[in-house]
């Protein structure tokens, strides 16, 4: 444990790692720190999994968990293949054998999607079906697991909450910590969520390119761009970040937080068409009409739902709006669906996002070694200029199965755009780049 204290203390004091030992530092400089670290628990092995929809930076959180756990003395860092569902089938890998050197870690940070695989599996109520819990805790005992980390969104936090509650019920000493992840940015009690910044950066850059492309012909046209976001408009709102000195940004942004008003929408499009010959509209896939119907369902009909009651896929909102505009206003229209590109475009990942994803992974491990359980790591924004954040913790039960919407005051009065406050919030999250390692002209990734 002192070896870990040595590393962290040297970083805090700006002392080169190879230059001095802890013994050479004046005791008054580190007594309190060492006392705090020495109270940390000894954990032999840890287990980490990934769940839900992937992001461009979810593997950076995995890297943070792995490196921090090893630095703090964990002998083995095991990974769940395909989340909790794969774990129930004892699909487990030893990450010590998979991540053999620093280059593997750097490749992992730059690899999109979920390195370990994912699932959308919901644990049952243990009062109704206790068998999966008995099976899981048997595996924890078999592999001598002292802490479990689950990287995911709202539904994944439900898994951590259930495991922590069951662990308390059976008086287990295992620690359960949630690591936040979602491009939707809808987790409660955190300023923002790792994964969102990179998706927002991709959306802003793509919208900017579409605006350029749509303006090449001297004729009236409307391009409708469909962006992910089932119940919240954080991703669609990120289209506003395309605006700058060389671009006005999208002409309209429609969010799920406001019900779609067909008459007002067509009137606004007609008005804008008189001012400029090309329009670009960003729309969340989950926009509903005043009757609570998804616009996409008006095209394709209701689809299947997953284990958590969410529609498995939403698609067709942009097509619906493009057809509506063409039918009523007669101009040329095009529907563009960004789809999974929003969450896997690692060459456009935000370095800020990658860094914070790694940090929350490490903070989760530190929390477990301090004896915390049933918590999720959070990000607290200290300041905008300069942009600075700190990590914290919240009870995972406060986050599980809940959603954070775009504040009403960040949505324009007519409900068809966002205010400058939204951009001030989101712009720091898309800053800087982490350049991929290119081989034969394409990015190199790491795979199991």
Explain the meaning of each model-derived region:
Residues 2-10, 15-17, 21-32, 36:
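Short, positively charged and aromatic/hydrophobic N-terminal segments
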Residues 297-448:
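C-terminal non-catalytic interaction/assembly regions of soluble proteins
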């Amino acid at each position: 444990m002192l070896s870990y204290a040595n590393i962290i203390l040297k970083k805090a004091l700006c002392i080169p790692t190879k230059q001095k030992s802890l013994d050479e530092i004046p005791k008054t400089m580190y007594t309190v720190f060492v006392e705090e670290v020495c109270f940390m628990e000894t954990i032999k092995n840890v287990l980490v999994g990934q769940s839900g929809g992937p992001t461009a930076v979810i593997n950076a959180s995995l890297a943070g968990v792995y490196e921090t756990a090893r630095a703090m003395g964990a002998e083995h860092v095991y990974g769940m293949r395909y989340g909790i569902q794969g774990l129930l089938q004892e699909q487990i890998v030893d990450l010590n054998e998979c991540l053999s050197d620093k280059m593997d870690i750097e490749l992992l940070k730059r690899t999109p999607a979920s390195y370990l695989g994912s699932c959308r599996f919901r644990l049952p109520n243990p009062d109704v079906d206790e068998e999966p819990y008995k099976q899981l805790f048997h595996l924890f005992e078999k592999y001598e697991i002292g802490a479990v980390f689950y990287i995911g969104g709202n539904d994944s936090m439900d898994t951590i909450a259930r495991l922590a509650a069951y662990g308390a019920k059976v008086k287990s000493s295992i620690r359960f910590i949630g690591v936040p992840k979602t491009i939707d940015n809808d987790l409660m009690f955190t300023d923002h969520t790792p994964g969102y910044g990179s998706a927002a950066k991709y959306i802003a850059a793509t919208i900017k390119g579409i605006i350029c492309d749509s303006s090449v012909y001297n004729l009236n046209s409307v391009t409708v761009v469909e962006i992910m976001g089932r119940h919240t408009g954080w991703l669609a709102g990120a289209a506003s970040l395309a605006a700058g000195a060389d671009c006005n940004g999208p002409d309209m942004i429609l969010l799920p937080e406001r019900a779609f008003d067909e008459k007002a929408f067509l009137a606004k499009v007609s008005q804008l068409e008189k001012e400029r010959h090309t329009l670009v509209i960003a729309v969340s896939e989950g926009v509903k009409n005043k009757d609570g119907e998804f616009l996409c369902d008006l095209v394709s009909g209701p689809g299947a739902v997953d284990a958590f009651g969410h529609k498995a896929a939403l698609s067709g909102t942009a097509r619906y709006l493009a057809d509506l505009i063409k039918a009523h206003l007669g101009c040329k229209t095009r529907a563009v669906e960004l789809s999974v590109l929003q969450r896997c475009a690692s060459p456009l990942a935000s370095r800020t996002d990658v860094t914070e994803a790694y940090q929350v992974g490490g903070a989760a491990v530190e929390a477990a070694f301090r004896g915390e359980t049933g918590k999720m790591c959070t990000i607290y924004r200290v300041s905008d200029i300069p942009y600075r954040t700190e990590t914290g913790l919240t009870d995972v039960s406060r986050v599980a199965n809940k959603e954070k919407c775009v504040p009403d005051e960040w949505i324009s009065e007519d409900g068809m755009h966002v205010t400058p406050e939204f951009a001030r919030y989101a712009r720091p999250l898309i800053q800087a780049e982490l350049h991929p390692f290119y081989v034969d002209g394409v990015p190199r990734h790491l795979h199991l």
